[in-house]
C-alpha cells in the first residue's frame, strides 16, 4: 500500500512538472546573466552525494551554486577546486566555494546562507576529521545530539535569512511499518530521526522539500562517478568486488533492493528548485533502479561478452554482526540491511517498472551502464586446469 501511494504521488508530481515545462517552452523568457540567477547553498559539499548535487546544479546553468564545506586541503576539497576551475573557465561566477563552514555553528551558517534563494541541507551523525570517521552511527557517543545541534544551528540560520524560500533535505526511504505491524526489527535510531527532521523544520515555518532516496551503493560498491579517472583496480574510489562467479551483496538473493546513483540525486534537486510550485513542502521518492540479487546475476550474464557466469553471494550477516563489535564501519550497513528487508521495512519502489514516471523527466542510471563502466562485461572465464 505504501509503495502504491508513493508511485501515485510521483506520477502526480511528474505530470505537474511536465505540464509547467510545456507551458514555459511555449512562452520562452529571455536568458538571464549569471548574476541574475538564484543562489543555492549546498552544505557538506565535499561528501559523495552533495558534491554530485553541486556539479549537477552547475550543469543546469539555472542557478548560482555556493558549495559549503569545512576542511580545506583534503582529497574531497581538491575535487571541488577542480570543478571550480572548470566552471570558471566556461561560466565565471556560477560556482563559489566556501570552506570553513561548521555545521554546528549558527553564526557560520547564517553567513553561508546569506542572499540564498534555496539551501540543500544535509546533516549527519558521523563526526570526522578530514574524512576519517570516528562515529559511524553509534549512538552511545552522542549521535542524536550531534544531528540536532546541526539542525538547530541550520534552523536559526534559515530564520535569519528570509531570502531562503525553499530547503531540500535528503532522507532515507519512507517507514511503512512502524506502529502499523508487529514483529519487525526496531528501526535504527538515525533512520527514525532523519525521517522526522523535515516535519520538524516545517513545523518551524520552513518550506522543506524532502527527497527520499536509498543508499548509493551497488553490490557492495559505492556508486561514485566523481573520480576523474575510472578503472578496476586498488583505488578505494573505483574498486568493485564483482568478478566471475561472484556478485556480492548484503541482502538475501530474492529480496528486491532500491539503488541510487548520486548523479540522479543532483538532477532531481535541480528539478525541485526549478519547479517550486510543484515541490514546495512535498515529500518525493526517487531511486535509480530496483533489482533482486538473482536479477543482478541475470543482467551481468546477459551483458558479458564472453559468456562468463556469475553467482550472487550475500555477505554473511553473522560476520557483519561479529565485525560490528570491533569496528564501527560496518554498523551502518548492518543496521540498514536489518531494517530494509523482508521482516522490516520495504523500499519505496516495488520493481524497476515503478520508476518509469521518473524517467519521463530524467534518464536514470542503470546497472547495465555501470557494468560497462566497471569493465565487468569484459571479464573472461578463467581457464580450467587440464
Predicted segment positions?
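N-terminal Rossmann-like NAD(P)+-binding domain of SDR-like oxidoreductases, especially those catalyzing
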Residues: 162-172
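Terminal hydrophobic/aromatic helix or amphipathic segment near a protein terminus
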Residues: 83, 284, 297-348, 386
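Oxidoreductase cofactor-interface core, primarily capturing Rossmann-like NAD(P)-dependent enzymes
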Residues: 9-64, 68-80, 104-106, 130-132, ...
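General small-molecule cofactor/ligand-binding pocket signal
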Residues: 66, 96-99, 209, 309-315
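Short, amphipathic alpha-helical "lid/cap" segments that border enzyme active or binding sites
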Residues: 110, 155, 262-270, 364-372
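Conserved hydrophobic beta-strands of the Rossmann-like cofactor-binding core
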Residues: 39-42, 119, 167
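Amphipathic terminal alpha-helices
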Residues: 3-25, 351-386
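NAD(P)H-binding glycine-rich loop region in Rossmannoid oxidoreductase-like domains
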Residues: 71-163, 176-182
